[in-house]
Amino acid sequence: VNVLGGIEYSINNATLCSVGFSVRVFNYAEGAVRGLTQGNACMGRGDSGGSWFTLFERQYGL
């Protein structure tokens, strides 16, 4: 899945929001992602985006 700037996309009830970048997601159900950075994720406290990014942080030790 590619998410381009200004577009929100829902994947398994998690909303991704990119800001001028392309976000490519692989194997979301297992938490594997590529190309996501803090700058292009919606990470509001308590929302699905925040949970999604936390999963990313745990996978890659950020």
Swiss-Prot record:
Inhibited by phenylmethanesulfonyl fluoride (PMSF) and p-chloromercuribenzoate (PCMB). The active site is at residue 48. Keywords: Antibiotic, Antimicrobial, Disulfide bond, Hydrolase, Protease, Secreted, Serine protease. One of its GO terms (molecular function) is serine-type peptidase activity. It is found in: Secreted. The keyword Manganese does not apply. One of its GO terms (biological process) is proteolysis. One of its GO terms (cellular component) is extracellular region. Optimum temperature is 70 degrees Celsius. It catalyses: Preferential cleavage: Ala-|-Xaa, Val-|-Xaa in bacterial cell walls, elastin and other proteins. Optimum pH is 8.0. Active from pH 7.0 to 11.0. It comes from the Bacteria. The keyword Disulfide bond applies. Its EC number is 3.4.21.12. Belongs to the peptidase S1 family. Has bacteriolytic activity. Monomer. This is Alpha-lytic protease L1. It comes from Lysobacter sp. (strain XL1).
